[in-house]
Amino acid sequence: MKEYYAARAKEYDQIYAKPERQVDLRLIEQWLPARFENARVLEIAAGTGYWTQFIAPVASNVLGLDASAETLQIAQARPNNESVQWLVGDAYALPAPVEPYDAAFAGFWFSHVPLARQKEFLLGLNKTLRSGARVVMLDNLYVEGNSTPLTEPDPEGNTYQVRTLADGSTHRVLKNYPNEFDLCELVAPFGEQATYTTWQYYWAFEYVLR
């Protein structure tokens, strides 16, 4: 996965240029910032910083973490991201903060987490947050005829896509599509105020840490 996103870094933002998704993107760009006003935010899988640029202007401060140095180089160059701190790191081994964060955001990351590691990831994330912190995840809905087709699931139930980059290389990428019930069940032991929001091509899920 790390190698795939490093190779894809320069062409990653092409996904935000798809004509049919522009209405959704404008709506989400307006919806997202209010979740992070005046908050100390940890962003997981910050990537090229596309979503960071909408969070940073309203947040108290943001730490954007990603496994790929190549994507973070692009993130640093965005106009609204000058004050953001960036860190190359592992989403499954998050650094302990000096002070717990007020909020966390994971955009287009949770769908890449293997089913067997979803609980592990969330518990690790929660350790970096204060009680009452808000967690927001944003990701893709599977839209027949528009989304990249899925291959057969593996023995654990994970699904995959075969993606081709501009250089012609092909990559088998884990891509799961959790539903509202799956997400609510996962966070029930430690989260409250769970909210699931959908647009035509995307979903968002929020919870507040107890």
Where in this protein do the model-derived segments appear?
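Conserved class I S-adenosyl-L-methionine
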Residues: 1-36, 39-45
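A short acidic, Gly/Pro-enriched loop at the edge of an enzyme's catalytic core
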Residues: 96-104
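A short glycine-rich, Lys/Arg-flanked "PGG" loop and its adjoining helix->strand segment in the class I
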Residues: 119-131
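C-terminal alpha-helical "lid/dimerization" subdomain adjacent to the S-adenosyl-L-methionine
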Residues: 138-189
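Core SAM-dependent methyltransferase catalytic element
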Residues: 192-210
